[in-house]
Structure formats: C-alpha cells, structure tokens
Amino acid sequence: MVILKLVQGLIANNILEKRFSYWLSDSSIATGMKLNNYLFSIFFTLIIIIFTTIHYSFPDSVKFLNNFPTHPDIRLVSISWIETAFKTAVLKGDSFFDGISFGIRTVLDFLELLFLETPWIVIFTLIVLLTTLSAGPRAGIVSGSFLAYMGLLGFWKLAMITIALLNTAAFLSIILGIPLGIFCSTRPRFYAFIRPIMDFMQTMPAFVFMIPIIAFFGVGKVAAVLITMIFGGTPVVRFTVLALKGVPSNVREAAISYGASKWYLLTKVDLPLAAPTIMAGVNQTVLLSLTMVVVASLVGAKGLGLEVLEALQYTNVGQGILAGIAILFCALILDKIVQGKKNS
C-alpha cells in the first residue's frame, strides 16, 4: 500500500508540474493583479496608514477623525420627510390598502372558519389522510401522533389558528410567486431588477419591514399575513425561475419543431419537467412562513406564536418549550404533505 501511494504521488507530481509549466507559458491566461489594482491598493493603504498614525499620535488635534462629521438636523429632517411621505401614502392609497386588507381577510376568515368550526376529528382525519396519501402510511401515523400531542396539551385551537394564518400567507405567496417566476424566466432584465428586491425582503430583519406594514395596515391578522409573505414568499419565485431555466433545451426544441404553441410549451413541457423543483420552492415558502409565527404574534396574530411570546415575556420555560414543539410538529406535518415521499 505504501509503495502504491508513493507511485501515485510521483505520477501526480509530474502531471501537476506539467500543467503548472503550461499555465506559466500561456500568455492568454492572466496572472496576478492588474496595474490599476496595484495602484489602488497602494493608494488606499497609504491613506489608512497616514490617518491611523495621525489619529493615535495626535488624538485631540484632528477631531473630525474621532466622529463621523454630521449634524443632528440631518436625521431629524430625514425622519420628518419619511413620516410625511408615509402619511401622504396612507391618505392617498386608503382605498388600495383597504382592498388588499379585504382580500386577505376573506381568505383568512374562510380558512379559520374551516379549521376552527369543523369538528376536530374531521380535521384530524383529513390531515392524516393527506399525509398518508402524500408520504405513505408511516408518515400518516407520525402526523397523527403530532396532532394528538397538540390536542392533549390544549394546543388544538391555537394550532388551527396558526395553520390558517400560515396557509393564507403561503397560498397568496404561491399564487403570486409562481406566475411571477414564470414571467421572470422569460424576462432576464426584469428578473435582474427584482432579484435585489427579493434579497432585501429575505435579509432585512422582520422588525424593520414591520414598521411600514403597520403604518399602512395597522396591527392585526392582515399585517401578520403580509409580514409572513414578505419573508417567506421569495423562494417560490427563485425556484420557479431556476426550474424553468433548467428545462433541457433539446426537449423544448423538439416540442417547437412539432408545432407546439407557447401555451402548450409552458403547460405541457416546461411546467411538468420543472414541477419537482417548483414544489421544493413551495416547500421552502411554507416552512419559512412558519418561522415567522412568533414574529407575527407581535402585530396581533394569535396562535402558537402568541404562546411562545407570552412564555418569553414571563419566563415560562415549560409553556415556551411545549408551544415551540407544537410549532415544530406543524412544520413537519406540512413538510410531509408538500414534499411527499422524498423526505419519508
């Protein structure tokens, strides 16, 4: 074995040496940094050294190095402008925001009525049946045990409220996200425009974009749904674009050569081939939406998130852990239903 490894090392050394020699002899391959990069690096290095030396050698002589030069009025004026802009937007777009609120409330009220007013045994059986059909009998048994946990500990109604809010946000995100992803897959410039916006939606802390949502829609369930959509709605768009761009070009060319129309190409070729990846995006949207349950409770959403929030406020460790486990079980059940046998 030692001799074999030694021979492999000698052969590999010769091969790598030849490749390195070829790389050095090839003038078309750029080596090192460009002259402009060297000059910029030297220039900024000198600036850093000079100002750092001045600051630590004469700390009181050059005061502008201690604090960034600004004026308090700049922030006050900026705050005033933003508040004026929001007040104007609320007044001018009152009917627009009311329409959005009405649409969200309609879906949410229907789902809450469905999950809360329907007998628990019907919902229990339906969820177990869906999980069994999607992921198999073992997953159905597991989901039944998760639901039994919520019922025995008194979390049933809270869990149904949470699932209703989550399904509202996920449903709206999906029906808006998939068409948007289809449109972006054929419009690279538009996708390049909205991609930074989606990055902003996912990276910005929820407490920051919670402020304009409350300013436009107030506190309550509508604001909770919108906050959940902002954070959890982007994966379905990204995955739809990725899935449609990954459809083999030879398959599309074959369909076009047989006279397939754009609608036929989309519905019979692209979407069926892209469906597994799109469903992965749907799964990510559902699970990311569920992570906003506790944050949504800060703006008036009830459910399991409120239980966790109260446990944090009163340092009730037991209540927080039990409610957190219930949220985890909701996520696992939804994951099994959406993903099916892939995760079984």
Sequence positions of predicted segments:
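Alpha-helical transmembrane segments of multi-pass membrane proteins
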Residues: L4-L10, L153, F231-R238, I327-D335
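Transmembrane alpha-helices
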Residues: L226-I230, P248, K262-A296, G318-L334, ...
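Transmembrane helix recognition focused on a "late"/terminal membrane span
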Residues: V2-Y56
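Interfacial loop/helix-cap signal at membrane boundaries in integral membrane proteins
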Residues: N67-W120
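Short amphipathic alpha-helical coupling elements at transmembrane boundaries
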Residues: K18-S25, F102, T106-L113, F146-M150, ...
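Transmembrane-helix boundary motif in ABC transporter permease subunits
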Residues: I127-S134, F146-K157, A169-M198
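Hydrophobic, membrane-inserted alpha-helices
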Residues: M1, I121-L129, S143-A148, V208-P212, ...
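Generic hydrophobic transmembrane alpha-helix motif, especially the helices
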Residues: L165-T168, L172-I178, I182-S185, R195-G232
